[in-house]
Amino acid sequence: MKKKRREGKKEKNMRTTHAERVTTHAAWFPSLPGAYKLNCDASFDPGSKSSGVGFLVRDHLDKSFIAISNPVTSNDILIGEALAIREGLLEAISEGTLSITVESDNLGIISCLMYPSKAPDLKILPIVEDIRHISSYLDDCNFSYIPRTANSVVDCLARRALSVSGRMVWPNSDPLLSGDIASDTRSVSCSSQ
């Protein structure tokens, strides 16, 4: 029994590249100065068979840098979650971001990004490999699981993607987006007490 725990602990501490670190957080909190947070999510409506992704990049002051809703062609939420991470990373890189923490409420995908020996579901394998490759272009890239309650902003962005016809870049002045960010921040302060 002790040997199993030790082996599990050893595997948990194993890191093969800078892009494969994962942590778990109970709530959203800002990044360190000079770094950014990328939150990602996907949404699927079985009735209309439409799906979409949402992602948001924020700086250490909790200021929204990029907020995007994008309809995607997928009838599987797992594929959508992986696509959201990949699209978010590509967008962050195109904006010049070099240090980022990727946060998602999909523990399975985050775990696969952390542990290369953990095989992802075959339907997302190519996307996970893309994410690993893309993240290698960043100076620092970490992956972190957060619960859905701390990911409400991008949940909203992903749901909005179901009602738009194409990629939508949301302005920082969008009152709903600002309200959602404030609620995520409040959940952080409540959980830290």
Features from the language model and the residues they span:
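Primary recognition of RNase H-like, Mg2+-dependent phosphodiesterase/nuclease domains
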Residues: 1-193
